[in-house]
Amino acid sequence: MNAPSWEKVITVLQKYQHFTLGCHLHPDGDGIGSVLALGLSLQKVGKQVEMILPEGIPVTFGFLPGIDQTVTDPTHQPEVILSLDCAERDRLQLPEELFHTNPILVNIDHHISNDGFGQVNLVLPDAAATGQIVFRLLKKAVLPIDAPIATALYTAIATDTGFFRYANTTGEVLSIAAQLVEDYQIPPAQIAERVYEERSFASLRLLAEVLATLQVADNPRYAWMYLNQEMT
């Protein structure tokens, strides 16, 4: 895979008008937050943007500003498809018909397994989250950030770092989080509460089924649970 090119991505964002954004199957906070942050920012500079979540809005992230602008099905053919937080082309959560007109595929991701499937790639495995890359992209491209966009970025970064508990929490990650909180007055405690405490009945039932499979070995250092297709 070629080296990531900020300039190529920025050129695409500046040159074209019609964008469709998507992320991986069963999206998490980083995928959804990255889609919202980049999509809302492009909207603010007059671009036509469609943010697609075919599986609908996960209850956990229903609080995010702009989430109501996402759609489950595309309504137009884009000039550019922006893939966020998706390591493989096959996992990109977008209908195949969007590719029939050969739009430019831009791949923005942080997974080390990403093979650079886009025509333009911005893949940074050292980044803790795709939201971290999107933040840097918005700054480099001089694209706007406001409170809703900052909330999406913070949620993206916080969820992929375990709210700054994982080993991928670097000084840059903490610096970005601090900027988002200080400059846009976003509420970290409320975001953490919504992410960790908002659960659908279906997710709670699934958790109960998985916990019911818990087994502990004779050696108490080992325990395991399992999740199978029937549970989901």
Predicted regions and their residues:
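An acidic intrinsically disordered interaction segment
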Residues: 1-7, 98-105, 125-134
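Hydrophobic helix-and-loop "lid/oligomerization" segment in the mid-to-C-terminal part
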Residues: 2-25, 31-62, 77-80, 159-232
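Short, motif-level signal for alpha-helix interfacial/capping segments enriched in acidic residues
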Residues: 3-8, 87-88, 137-140
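Solvent-exposed alpha-helices and their adjacent loops that cap or buttress functional pockets
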Residues: 12-13, 74-75, 97-100, 114-115, ...
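Glycine-rich, phosphate-binding/catalytic loops in enzymes
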Residues: 38-39, 98-101, 123-124, 175
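Active-site cofactor/cluster-binding pocket
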Residues: 65-120
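Short alpha-helices
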Residues: 108-178
